[in-house]
């Protein structure tokens, strides 16, 4: 797990709980019907705006946010330059043996098409389509989390209004008004917490993960195209390092 995510989640929730404890009895902030309404309705309302198949992927999306490792662009560039050196020294057909131990299917498919003599424009089109589909899947997952972040506060407000109506319908006991109002406001609190301490931060993190993977695969596409065109390995490296920030770019060139 990314330590930054772990620190962010644990730290945020600890601060929330600590603030609740400062307010007195923690029990006054717990109301099961309010929890069920906010959490349950925030999920069920997704069926209005998203296919059921997409909603089933929520656990997988969360797993990706928490456990997916950020790809190393530096290592990727080093690998692509290595393939360029092999292709220049032994011919592009020799890469067929070099990719047998590679786990990344995107790299394998791209280089295999180059080895097979596929038209360069077709290679780029196929790989770009694959990348576009990846972006679409990531956007779908991000959209689900953003929808939860949008609807949870609304569900909380609905719960608060229900509670207020119930409270105001019976004012025979003035002493119970304060307690009733407190319970009514809990759903608004829960909705705000779900949105701002869970769903929206996860959506932002998924967007960052997506951007990292898009950059990674874009470098692969450019690398495969450079290898296929027979570029000098040094030129391949210079082309690919343009995708890095200037500081990393210079550091990588010095290491090389």
Map each language-model feature to its residues.
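Large intracellular
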Residues: 4, 15-141, 213-256
